[in-house]
């Protein structure tokens, strides 16, 4: 598996074979070029973290998940540990409650939502709307379009104020 960005409820990570082996990640969906995944975790008490766990752990902060030896970790202003999770062979330490996505190093005010949030949209970025690989920016979308997108998608990325990124999952009957 080549490196790619995977959006998870815990944040965004650059996935490589190593991370995929360390974390129990399952791919759930795609939104255009973005992969939507889930990390199977079990919350643990922070006091149960051992020194040996710290040698191979990950940190979640401001919408990004990085390994403990990442250069990106130096940019994190970590003041506290909010929670800790065990996943497969490692620990993930959450250092804030921010679920804002950090996609491709552009800290953006976007969050992962169920596709029902498409009904709050005034602007839609739609991938794969009419044909595979297409992209459309739609201002003031119709309710009919929103309904069709809702039925074709499971997730969307939203700023919470009306800007939605969604995948139309084009097929022969879409928008007919």
UniProtKB/Swiss-Prot annotation:
Keyword Signal in annotation: yes
Alphabetical UniProt keywords: Host endosome, Host-virus interaction, Inhibition of host adaptive immune response by virus, Inhibition of host MHC class II molecule presentation by virus, Signal, Viral immunoevasion
Subcellular location: Host endosome
Protein name per the record: Protein OPG163
GO biological process, any: symbiont-mediated suppression of host antigen processing and presentation of peptide antigen via MHC class II
Record flagged with keyword Signal: yes
Species whose genome carries this gene: Vaccinia virus (strain Western Reserve) (VACV)
Gene (UniProt): OPG163
An annotated GO cellular component: host cell endosome
Family as reported in the entry's similarity comment: Belongs to the orthopoxvirus OPG163 family.
């Amino acid at each position: 598996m080549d490196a790619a960005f995977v959006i998870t409820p815990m944040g965004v990570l650059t996935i490589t074979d190593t991370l995929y082996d360390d974390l129990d990640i399952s791919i759930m969906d795609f939104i255009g070029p973005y992969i939507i995944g889930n990390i199977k975790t079990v919350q643990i008490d922070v006091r149960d973290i051992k020194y040996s766990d710290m040698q191979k752990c990950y940190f979640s902060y401001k919408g990004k998940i990085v390994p403990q030896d990442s250069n990106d970790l130096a940019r994190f202003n970590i003041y506290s540990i909010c929670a800790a999770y065990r996943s497969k062979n490692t620990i993930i330490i959450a250092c804030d409650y921010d679920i804002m996505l950090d996609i491709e190093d552009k800290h953006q005010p976007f969050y992962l939502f169920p596709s029902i949030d498409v009904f709050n949209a005034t602007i839609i970025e739609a991938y794969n709307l009419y044909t595979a690989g297409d992209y459309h920016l739609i201002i003031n979308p119709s309710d009919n379009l929103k309904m069709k997108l809702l039925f074709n998608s499971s997730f969307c990325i939203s700023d919470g104020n009306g800007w939605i990124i969604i995948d139309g999952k084009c097929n022969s009957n879409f928008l007919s």
